[in-house]
Structure formats: C-alpha cells, structure tokens
C-alpha cells in the first residue's frame, strides 16, 4: 500500500523535505510508519517520541482526522492515506 507522510515545522527541517512516501504492508499502524520514518532520519525520533510513545505535543492526522478520534497511534493505514504530523506551537 502506498501512503504519504507530511511533516511541518522543525520536523520538516530534520526530514529535509515536506513529504515522505512509503510502501507499507496491510495492517501497518501510524505508530509503526512514524517509527520507520524516524529510523531513516537522525534526530526525528527524539522529536516524535518520548519513552517510546508518541509525544502528546504532536498532532497526527490521517486523511484530515486526528488519530485520537480513530484508534490513536494504533490506527491502521489504508492505501493512499495522507498522514500529517505537526508539532504543537509553544511559547510564552
């Protein structure tokens, strides 16, 4: 299955481009996709994960719907899914 993963803000800087396209097996989860992409881009894992869990400060959507309204990081991907990963903006 073909999926696209779009990165924004500092995540895009680490990845070096806006979109990463992947071929994944059926039943692949959002969490597994992000883990494999992070494996290919040094520094991305520290931005995405804390204690092997997706950081709460990350907004992850699948086809425009936040994954928390689906099955969280365990949401299974389907062909031509668009995953968007955006860090929360924090400041004072």
Where is each model-derived feature located?
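Ubiquitin-like/PB1-type beta-grasp interaction modules and other compact soluble beta-rich domains
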Residues: 1-91
């Amino acid at each position: 299955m073909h999926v696209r993963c779009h990165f924004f803000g500092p995540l895009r800087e680490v990845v070096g481009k806006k979109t990463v396209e992947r071929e994944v097996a059926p039943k692949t989860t959002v969490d597994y996709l992000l883990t494999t992409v992070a494996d290919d881009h040094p520094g991305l894992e520290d931005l995405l994960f804390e204690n092997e869990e997706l950081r709460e400060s990350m907004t992850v959507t699948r086809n425009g719907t936040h994954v928390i309204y689906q099955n969280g990081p365990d949401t299974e991907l389907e062909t031509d899914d668009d995953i968007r990963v955006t860090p929360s903006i924090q400041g004072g």
